[in-house]
């Protein structure tokens, strides 16, 4: 009896580890349908983050052309990885506006100098109010907005090269 009790913690540990490995190996559904999709943007006006770059408002995003709105930050490591993909989208004719979250102008300027600037406008969301109103919880995160200011798609996390076709398709459907 005591021998069985001695091995019980080891057996329990093996069972827990096996369960953990199984859970980590099981693919999860990475597509999250936003509760904001199909809804108009909440009204907002953000100040310009940088001199020479226009400010950003919800009215700018209802000007007739589908756009990609990208929440980013200079301190965000995945945003650095996403930067070349945003440049690729810009080269393909995608209109991209940025919302800098909890950031400083000098840090954003340095980030864009190092990683490229795909943005037509950059608004400063210093208190994350617009980010929260859109149901976003982190950076990077992007939204496809149709020409009437309605949210058509929410992409959580960095846009990767494999996501470009999906983003282009979402923008085309937003026309």
What do these predicted regions represent?
Residues 1-47, 175:
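N-terminal targeting signals for export/organelle localization
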Residues 45-68:
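A short beta-strand-turn-helix
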Residues 91-127, 139:
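Conserved segment of the thioredoxin-like fold in thiol-based oxidoreductases
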Residues 113-118, 125-175:
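Thiol/disulfide oxidoreductase modules built on the thioredoxin-like
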Residues 68-69, 96, 142:
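Hydrophobic beta-strand anchors of alpha/beta hydrolase catalytic cores
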Residues 71-88:
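Conserved redox-active cysteine motifs that mediate thiol-disulfide chemistry
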Residues 42, 72, 97:
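Conserved Rossmann-like nucleotide-binding pocket used by diverse enzymes
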Residues 64-67, 72-75, 138:
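Short pre-active-site segment immediately N-terminal to redox-active cysteine/selenocysteine motifs
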């Amino acid at each position: 009896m005591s021998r069985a009790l001695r091995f019980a913690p080891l057996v329990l540990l093996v069972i827990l580890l096996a369960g953990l490995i199984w859970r980590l190996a099981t693919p999860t559904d990475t597509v999250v349908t936003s509760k904001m999709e199909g809804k108009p943007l909440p009204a907002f006006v953000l100040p310009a983050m940088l001199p020479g770059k226009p400010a950003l408002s919800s009215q700018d995003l209802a000007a007739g052309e589908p756009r990609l709105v990208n929440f980013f930050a200079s301190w965000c490591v995945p945003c650095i990885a996403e930067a070349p993909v945003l440049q690729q989208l810009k080269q393909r004719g995608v209109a991209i506006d940025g919302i800098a979250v909890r950031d400083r102008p000098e840090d954003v300027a340095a980030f864009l100098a190092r990683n490229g600037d795909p943005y037509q406008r950059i608004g400063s969301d210093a208190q994350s109010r617009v980010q929260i109103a859109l149901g976003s919880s982190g950076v990077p995160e992007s939204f496809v907005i149709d020409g009437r200011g309605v949210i058509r798609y929410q992409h959580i996390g960095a846009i990767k090269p494999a996501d470009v076709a999906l983003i282009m398709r979402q923008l085309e459907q937003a026309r």
